[in-house]
Amino acid sequence: MNKTDVIVIGAGVVGAATARELSRYNLNVLVLEAGSDVAEGASKANSAIVHAGFDAKPGTNKAKFNVAGNRMFEDVCRELKVPFKRNGSLVLAFGEEEEKALEDLKAKAEQNGVPVEIIDQAELRKREPRVSEAATKALWAPTGGICCPYELTFRYAENAAANGVEFAFDAKVVEVKSKSKLKLRVEGEGEGEGWVVKTADGREFEAKAIVNCAGIHSDELNNQVSKTKYNIEARRGEYLMLDKDEDGTFAATMFQVPSKMGKGILVSPTVDGTVIVGPTAEDIGDKEDKATTYEGLEKVKEGAMRTYPALPLGKVITEFSGLRAHETTKGDFVLGEVSDAPGFFNALGVESPGLTSAPALGLYLAGEVASKLGASKKNEAIISKDVSYWPKTREMEPEELAALVEKDPSFGRVICRCEEVTEGEIRAAIRARVGARTLDGIKRRTRSGMGRCQGGFCTPRLIEILAAELGVAPEKFLLSRKTAPKELREEAAARLVSAKAQVEDYDVIVVGAGPAGLAAACAAKDNGANKVLCIERDDAPGGILQQCIHNGFGLHRFSEELTGPEYAQRWVDMAKERGVEIVCGTMVLKVDPTRITAMSPRGGLKSYRTKSVVLAMGCRERPRGALMTPGTRPAGVYTAGTVQRLVNMDGIMPGKKVVILGSGDIGLIMARRLTFSGAKVLACIEIMKKSSGLMRNVVQCLNDYDIPLLLSHTVTDVEGREHVTGVKVAKVDDNLKPIPGTEMHFDCDTLVLSCGLIPENELTKKAGIEMDPKTRGPKVDPKTMATSVPGIFAGGNVVRVYDLVDWVSRDSEIAGKSAALYAKGL
């Protein structure tokens, strides 16, 4: 039996904060977590708000610890290097009745010691011009803030581990008993002093004290040891997340007047630059049901539009839900030592404002435990402040970044293009003391896969890195979010030194070396450009066609039918024949008409001077979040392009029973490819009245293999907790709304999304180029492919999504010719 002084059950933000505070004492501390990582429960799925404290009932634990935690938050985040912003919060009133509620909130705030003021409509509109004109007044709370809850949890755990706290994951506690009931006697100790904890896999641990931070399951543990029973109801909240394009929509967190169920639908900026919308509040019986629902997401949209009538649903990048631990008998945080269970300490029913309260709760609980055990504090000089912090390259100055890449080239290899996360950051996240063991773990530590494509591009690379670092077969990361536990490893922080970026000169620089970029480069050369450079973020030129092993390309451009790799190679050869320089594995960070800034693991940070630029970054797939498909969030949901890469390039089959949502060409082609590889494609589901793909692909990829195409249907629910087990499908009406009573069910292990492509235009927007809201690409002159910024041209799918790659090449040649003429001053 493993013995320790203190066991903390649960590695959410409260458990991690408590562990960190306990690490300041001369105690042996073990954290047992049911999930495979920290922040697996409410700490990963909440509003990320640091509440001011005006809403909590005066005199309650919620009020006391909310205010105390808020005051500690800034210092804690600075110590742990966690992003935090005190942006303030506004509670909106719509009419006289709700204005009275603001007065009640103001009175509560004054009793709780929270500074607030009520502002009129004119002042509200001055501060927040985009707020609804129906809002008549607002309560302003300047001490409200925003943070990153999962990063805070991880950094708490990292600092605790640096001070000797041990963490055991996949360790669900199923039984807690006092030694007195087990009639255990340990030499040198009295009978009944301490506790024995048993996990689901049969492991047993012995401790002098237990801290119950088990979230929605904390009532179950309390009720095993105490006559005082509590009941926790899982309260589900559903959210939408908007793209970083919406950053700056509101400065403050925008609340509505709260109800007995919660603080209502909010619209708030995040520290990461996105906008969060939600949550709903629904009491459910299943403590594991984190599925989103059609009805819930509709409520989020409806509620948010009350605050923000212009809510841009086209900018939704993901949807998710979280479960709050709502205690029904007391309605407050239940804290401290249980009177009839000495040595057992509760942090029970910690719902909102639990995140805000976490620093104060950790301090309080650790103090209570230390006092009970008579533990002394460690010498302050030996307490580690290290949190295994690694550089965030997207936030670094150019000279600083260049020096880092020179020292460690992996920090120059961008894996996640949306969030500009490098291989070095990902490997550091895995190698941390409390390191990432899953795709979700990497996501929460680095933001890889959290951007607008939601992992559509980077997932295969992340799997490759995880598998190499952890010695686990890549397939395991497709089957489940959990992997076998591995010993924690330590890594020293990289030291940064000064260096200067290198500069080279060109006539035309093309961003992207897919068919569009290569065609533009060839045309530039053919029209008199002397030095032409293609910069490609992938490790080889050719773009997405390298994974399109089917034929059907080139009939219009080369008068012969080619496979994707053959078509790409044709352009690669033509570019090389003309003397076009191609640099791969290089991520462009900034575009100006006369200068390109890029980064690579080999060349570090480089600056290229140029006379003109062609943008040819291609497009990306619409992820599940943008579709707002309800259901759970298990492994087994992939975009068609991701499946195409896994099967065609990595030799990995994602599943055996497949449903395809959407009838885009990639999805249709993958239906045939998966069938060839031994999978059973059950159906292709299309919400519109006709397929969005080419008719020849419908015939050759579906009809020829007896795969049904269900038009005017959509997926209404994704089932499965760890991995997809099935989907529900329903007919839709003329407004694309599901028709009740038309549902059908498919047992499947994989859902493939083929629901359209979107031009990849992050660099375009950064360059200040005018965008076309219809195509979601840059506005261009069709005769020259010139953008609104002189000297910058664009070609291919970055402008609009084409049906055929031949037309991509054709229009990109126009862009390349125009760029060459511009460079010559013509």
Annotate each language-model stretch with its function.
Residues T4-L30, V508-K531, M670-L674:
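N-terminal Rossmann-like FAD-binding beta1-loop-alpha1 element of flavoenzymes
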Residues R20-R24, L80-R86, N212-F344, P353-L363, ...:
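Active-site substrate-recognition segment that forms the wall
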Residues R24-K44, N527-L545, I685-K689:
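Glycine-rich FAD pyrophosphate-binding loop
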Residues A48-E123, R127, T136, G264-I265, ...:
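Dinucleotide-binding Rossmann-like beta1-alpha1 core, especially the glycine-rich loop
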Residues P83-V91, L105, R125-N163, G194-V197, ...:
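Helix-loop-beta segment of a Rossmann-like dinucleotide-binding subdomain
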Residues Q111-E117, A122, K126, A134-A135, ...:
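FAD-binding core/adjacent interface of flavoenzyme oxidoreductases
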Residues S180, V197-K198, S218, Y230, ...:
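A Rossmann-like FAD-binding core segment of flavoenzymes
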Residues G262, V271-D272, D283, E288-V414, ...:
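C-terminal catalytic lobe of FAD-dependent flavoproteins
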